[in-house]
Amino acid sequence: MKRYRHTGWFGLVAIAVLMVSTSAMSNAQSAQHPQWVGTWAASPMLALDGRAMRPFAAVTLREIAHVSNGGEQVRVRFTNEFGLDGLTIGDAHVALSGGGSAIKDGTDHALTFGGASSVRIPPGAAIYSDPVALAVPALSDVAVSFYLPSQVMRGETYHAFADQVNFVADGDVSGAATLPSPTELKSWYFMDGIDVNAAEGARAIVTLGDSITDGALATENANSRWPDVLAARLKQEHGLENISVLNEGIGGNRVLNDQAGPSALARLDRDVLAQDGVRYFIVLESINDIGRLARLTGPEDEVTAPMLEQGLKQIADAAHEHGIKAFGATLTPYGGAGYSSEKGEQMRKDVNNWIRTSGTFDGVVDFDQITRDPQNPDRFNPLYDSGDHLHPSDAGYKAMGDGIDLKLFK
């Protein structure tokens, strides 16, 4: 049993002085080491085919990221996760985008890495730039430019579907106001995150999913994916304006098996648990696992509803172990899609029923109810169908983002 003795007035004064000193030290440390929160993210994957892989030699890439939270300092995360050789970045800059390949006057800042202007990222690794003072408005476009000198490059790390035009130009033109004679790119290469210094109460939502989260068939450069719609709504909601949304969708992704990028289970640590400031996440995955039932290529494709439910439960349980609230999103209709089947449709309904009723999640986002045709619930509402009967249109993405109950984040 602990024993206590009277401290007297001198002891109380000493304790008070210690508390003030500790508080001052804590405030000083906080000022020196700001809290970071992710404001933009893209899930990296391996570029395998000749269309995706590029002969990046002595060129500058300028990649555009639509951020959610704003801040007064920014840092950029570069990745060589799938490279078999070290990746050298010879020069890097960050600025506010001026549209196209242009940057806004007076916003260009050189990035450094431990004080150096260049860095070599080992195979399988990622690295943050040093923080730089740049006032980044919420919901703005940031341009990150980096020079790749000639080097051996086996295995390129990228995010295939950017739904955003990026640029590449010859030579080291990272600080150019506008890139000279650029070529357009439709992917993000070697960059998978941007953080800002956090305002009080800042935190992040991660959206983990497939092409429906990635924004397939949404209007290019319009930032009309459902996570974008959610991010814009949060900025208008008192008390939630400092919540960012990190889109970790990969087109073609699956829960249980690698297909396009690592499976949701395999990338959970990287894309959800390790994100700076994450407090919530929404998972919308399984439709590609289900779709494979119509196109079996091996025994691993023969999934069942209980298998998918167990995979989703593992994802939710891992989030809970890290103090993150997990929200399950029901699977949107896919009747009439190229890989739809009667067996798959029944499985979709079974998984959706489990998401709604199992109690696994801290809340449910019922995208199925939001997007389905009231007259034919196995199919998308025609108002929300992109035309392929699998992916939403811009109007469908907006309905999804608008249909999320913001009370989940209060």
Residue ranges and their predicted role:
Residues 11-21:
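Bacterial N-terminal signal peptides
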Residues 2-3, 24-208, 218-221, 239, ...:
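N-terminal secretory targeting modules
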Residues 215-228:
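Glycine- and acidic-residue-enriched helix-capping/strand-helix junction motifs
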Residues 218, 250-306:
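Oxyanion-hole/transition-state-stabilizing segment in secreted/luminal serine hydrolases
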Residues 2-13:
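Bacterial N-terminal signal peptides that target proteins for export
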